[in-house]
Amino acid sequence: MNVLNEKSLTVRGKDRYKSGVMSYKKMGYWEPDYTPKDTDIICLFRVTPQDGVDPIEAAAAVAGESSTATWTVVWTDRLTAAEKYRAKCYRVDPVPGAEGQYFAYIAYDLDLFEPGSISNLTASVIGNVFGFKPLKALRLEDMRLPVAYVKTFKGPPTGIVVERERLDKFGRPLLGATVKPKLGLSGRNYGRVVYEALKGGLDFTKDDENINSQPFMHWRERFLYCMEAVNRAQAATGEIKGSYLNVTAATMEDMYERAEFAKELGSVVVMIDLVIGYTAIQSMSNWARKNDMILHLHRAGHSTYTRQRNHGVSFRVISKWMRLAGVDHIHAGTVVGKLEGDPLTTRGYYDICREEHNPMQLEHGIFFDQNWASLNKMMPVASGGIHAGQMHQLIQHLGEDVVLQFGGGTIGHPMGIQAGATANRVALEAMILARNEGRDYVSEGPDILAKAAASCTPLKQALEVWKDVTFNYQSTDAPDYVTTPAVA
């Protein structure tokens, strides 16, 4: 790994505080000899300097502008513990295969951050600095969050273990479906979709991100019909069922009102969108914890800043923030579906959601060891362009602690919604049985599905309708240090 080496140029003593403009390197934001403390928050930025800008100066500027610096020397620095509070860029590496881009490692003292506040954390590390003129682009790739900081957060209110206990469902992925079309259905027809899907074998149905309270269906009407459907499906199947009721609204007062009504109706889960903001997410997490509710997060809007390789915030960082903030479910990609998702990078997202400790794995895009202390695990959700014919691939790539959501793959079934749900449930049960028997379910997957379909007409129809459907596009966000193998 080629590391840019340049000794510290920090000006010390009275010359450091002379009025005027001084380079960020000289102000102390470049410290190549610094060894990060166990309690430091470390950020890895992908820095793309403007032409002619020294990459180390650009990296030092990121450290300065995301901590204590401004554009000129200020004498009030002498009233603070400036040496302590300055963020320190201690390493700059060229990004492999990306000319003009650099990885900058920056350490922040823990005292720079308010305990237990995602809003405060993000105001520093992705605040003003992303608009800094000397940079063409800037991306926050990863973070190391010290245990001392992690433990100031409450984390997911329910967690994977307790959720499975409440549902009494173990040893397999959970199955869901997003109601389609996402907009335009009446409350009565919406409830009918929920009932058919749950009766057919799904564990959950879900509101989509932009179904809130529109003229064609107000939120209270939707909640009533959905919960009637859930209760009827539970009575018909003898299984615990749920529907993610989206309580996203214009104000916190409205969201609390909707969540309380969902609880009164007996719902086990409520849903929010990422676009409500970090403070609102933490507030809803506190509500869910107090009311023993599962909290589902739709990552609506994330691609506006996670999609581009050289600018924005990586979804692995968003995943870390959401585990701190405290959500139980988070959409994390499918690998084989219609949405962006490099296989190795997606594996890294899932590891962040589900593991107690994440070791550094550059092949998964994870640059730091991360200890999650005692925080609950999040259940990742795979949604977007998946169908029963991909079941062996989904289990291979995503494991069993995941919600597999077949929206179009349920509701678009030629025999109807209930048949679509049954097709997915039978495909899943057949694949899990093969796995538990020790068979090579990945290579034998198509044969396993074909054999199950011989005695299940809905699955046979699903395999026929979607047999040629794939979404094989080049990912825009793949690991920098390895080449991702093709999806089988």
Swiss-Prot record:
The highest taxon in the source lineage is: Bacteria
The UniProt entry annotates the active site at: 180, 298
- Cofactor(s) in the UniProt record: Mg(2+)
Pfam families per UniProt:
RuBisCO_large (PF00016), RuBisCO_large_N (PF02788)
GO biological process terms, alphabetically, are:
reductive pentose-phosphate cycle
**Keyword ATP-binding attached:** no
How the cofactor is bound: the record states: Binds 1 Mg(2+) ion per subunit.
Its biological purpose: RuBisCO catalyzes two reactions: the carboxylation of D-ribulose 1,5-bisphosphate, the primary event in carbon dioxide fixation, as well as the oxidative fragmentation of the pentose substrate. Both reactions occur simultaneously and in competition at the same active site.
Per its UniProt record, what PANTHER family does this chain match? RIBULOSE BISPHOSPHATE CARBOXYLASE (PTHR42704), RIBULOSE BISPHOSPHATE CARBOXYLASE LARGE CHAIN (PTHR42704:SF17)
- Similarity comment text for this entry: Belongs to the RuBisCO large chain family. Type I subfamily.
The protein's matches in HAMAP family, at most eight in alphabetical order, are given as: RuBisCO_L_type1
Full protein name: Ribulose bisphosphate carboxylase large chain 2
Task: Record the organism.
Answer: Nitrobacter hamburgensis (strain DSM 10229 / NCIMB 13809 / X14)
Source organism phylogeny: Bacteria, Pseudomonadati, Pseudomonadota, Alphaproteobacteria, Hyphomicrobiales
